[in-house]
């Protein structure tokens, strides 16, 4: 499809994808059938031709809603008719996940995407609006800089080319491509906090603070991400200099709390801030004390933190 044949919204989405996949041989697109990911998938066809890249689309069916199989099949058929390589992957979501159904679905979805992708990058359709919502949720939870930095453009194999694109643009892009995206009923369900942020909080913030509030929140996330990377690099340098091992963290007493917190976070990447602070609390407690963390237990002995991993 020539550049001039795309409508303005579709072109904005397609160019965002092109900028990210330039120089990539092959990539995978995760798609739910909703407007963001459907626009991403169609834009990827345009971008892959311009960049001479191969692209596959994976539609993940979480099997959590009645009719989800029909949505997945319909989305695949639409993309195949548009000349794309598309497949459906069905996943089982752990209903007992302690982090809740949304986190469990995310874990299952990403595992399915990586299974198809191998070592290829996986593109996801998060927009600037998603970024703004993520920052607000992190603020409400009292999160640190890593979470407040929001969604990174590249996070391992998962790439997010649409972080400078508004949700309204992906919706309009679907109109310009003359496709009807699936509307996830969960997106408007007030039982879900993210849905309430989207449908209740953001409209009020835009009314009070102006229509560019999402852009401002996203810009703050970008600034924090750059600073967070510097802090992480300093923490890793400190760990190298002090002989930190996978199960052993010495010499943390007397270190400034900001650096100490990040050293522990790098040492325990699955830990949340509540776990990190609990581990730091061991530094001022009696020897032999310990705290449970994801995957194991940390104990303090003779000024050194030890991690006993849970099998």
UniProtKB/Swiss-Prot annotation:
Database matches in HAMAP family: tRNA_Ile_lys_synt
Signal sequence bounds: none
EC number of the protein: 6.3.4.19
PANTHER family cross-referenced by the UniProt entry: TRNA(ILE)-LYSIDINE SYNTHASE-RELATED
Keywords from the UniProt entry: ATP-binding, Cytoplasm, Ligase, Nucleotide-binding, tRNA processing
EC category: ligase
GO annotations of cellular component type: cytoplasm
Record's protein name: tRNA(Ile)-lysidine synthase
Keyword ATP-binding: yes
Domain notes: The N-terminal region contains the highly conserved SGGXDS motif, predicted to be a P-loop motif involved in ATP binding.
InterPro entries linked: Rossmann-like_a/b/a_fold (IPR014729), TilS/TtcA_N (IPR011063), tRNA_Ile_lys_synt (IPR012094), tRNA_Ile_lys_synt_N (IPR012795)
GO molecular function: ATP binding; tRNA(Ile)-lysidine synthase activity
GO BP term (any one): tRNA modification
Record keyword Ligase present: yes
Annotated residues for binding of ATP: 32-37
Reactions that this protein is recorded to catalyse: cytidine(34) in tRNA(Ile2) + L-lysine + ATP = lysidine(34) in tRNA(Ile2) + AMP + diphosphate + H(+)
Family in the record: Belongs to the tRNA(Ile)-lysidine synthase family.
Protein localization: Cytoplasm
Species whose genome carries this gene: Cutibacterium acnes (strain DSM 16379 / KPA171202)
Role played: Ligates lysine onto the cytidine present at position 34 of the AUA codon-specific tRNA(Ile) that contains the anticodon CAU, in an ATP-dependent manner. Cytidine is converted to lysidine, thus changing the amino acid specificity of the tRNA from methionine to isoleucine.
């Amino acid at each position: 499809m020539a550049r001039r044949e795309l409508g303005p919204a579709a072109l904005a989405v397609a160019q965002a994808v092109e900028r990210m996949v330039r120089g990539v041989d092959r990539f995978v697109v995760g798609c739910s059938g909703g407007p963001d990911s459907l626009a991403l998938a169609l834009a990827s066809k345009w971008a892959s031709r311009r960049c001479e890249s191969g692209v596959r689309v994976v539609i993940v069916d979480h099997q959590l809603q009645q009719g989800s199989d029909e949505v997945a099949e319909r989305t695949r058929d639409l993309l195949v008719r548009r000349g794309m390589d598309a497949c459906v992957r069905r996943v089982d979501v752990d209903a007992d996940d302690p982090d809740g159904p949304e986190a469990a679905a995310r874990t299952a979805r990403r595992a399915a995407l990586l299974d198809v992708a191998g070592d290829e990058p996986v593109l996801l359709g998060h927009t600037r609006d998603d970024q703004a919502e993520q920052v607000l949720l992190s603020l409400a939870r009292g999160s640190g800089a890593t979470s407040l930095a929001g969604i990174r453009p590249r996070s391992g194999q998962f790439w997010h080319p649409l972080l400078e694109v508004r949700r309204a643009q992906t919706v309009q892009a679907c109109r310009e491509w003359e496709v009807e995206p699936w509307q996830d009923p969960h997106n408007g369900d007030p039982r879900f906090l993210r849905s309430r942020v989207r449908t209740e909080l953001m409209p009020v913030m835009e009314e009070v603070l102006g229509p560019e509030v999402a852009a401002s929140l996203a810009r703050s996330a970008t600034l924090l991400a750059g600073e967070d990377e510097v802090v992480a690099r300093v923490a890793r340098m400190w760990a190298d200099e002090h002989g930190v091992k996978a199960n052993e963290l010495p010499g943390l007493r007397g270190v400034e709390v900001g650096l100490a917190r990040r050293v522990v976070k790098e040492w325990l990447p699955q830990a949340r801030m509540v776990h990190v602070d609990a581990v730091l609390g061991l530094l001022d407690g009696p020897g032999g004390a310990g705290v449970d963390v994801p995957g194991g237990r940390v104990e303090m002995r003779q000024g050194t933190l030890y991690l006993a991993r849970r099998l």
